[in-house]
Amino acid sequence: MVKLTQRLGGLVLRFAAFCAALGAVIAMITSRERSSFFVISLVAKYSDLAAFKYFVIANAIVTVYSFLVLFLPKESLLWKFVVVLDLMVTMLLTSSLSAAVAVAQVGKRGNANAGWLPICGQVPRFCDQITGALIAGLVALVLYVFLLIFSIHHVVDPFLLRKS
């Protein structure tokens, strides 16, 4: 019964992480807004910024990985390798979220020292959608941290309980 509960808990966490990463990808990809000021037209889209592209690619990789691991049989020897992959995915999510948040912060507040003006006043819907994508990415990251702890415990625990 305990093994079934552990397996089910891991699957629920993985499915939630899959949904969060997929939501982050969808929210980021669909973020686009056009704004005009007299004769000047501004089009804001995620693909204009490398950090946002990286965020989309990283979360897409996490989405595919999460989906594939959901169907991994519980008897498979690959579960020991899943711990390593979970660690890599957690690091990938951390780096992509950090880069995207840094760029979003500059977009929201600007940088007076560099002479960069904030754009969220001109394209608020775009900025709100980016914020939603970043929140979904943060949720995916937190879930993957829990999954990493869960995976380490699941793989290492039998070795700790073994009698010598």
UniProtKB/Swiss-Prot annotation:
GO terms for cellular component: plasma membrane. The keyword Flavoprotein does not apply. It comes from the Eukaryota. The chain crosses the membrane at residues 9-29, 52-72, 81-101, 130-150. Keywords: Cell membrane, Membrane, Transmembrane, Transmembrane helix. Residues 1-8, 73-80, 151-164 are cytoplasmic. InterPro entries: CASP/CASPL, CASP_dom, CASPL. Residues 30-51, 102-129 are extracellular. It is found in: Cell membrane. The keyword Membrane applies. Its main location: membrane. It is a multi-pass membrane protein. It holds the Pfam family CASP_dom. Belongs to the Casparian strip membrane proteins (CASP) family. Homodimer and heterodimers. This is CASP-like protein 1C2. It comes from Arabidopsis lyrata subsp. lyrata. The lineage of its organism: Eukaryota, Viridiplantae, Streptophyta, Embryophyta, Tracheophyta.
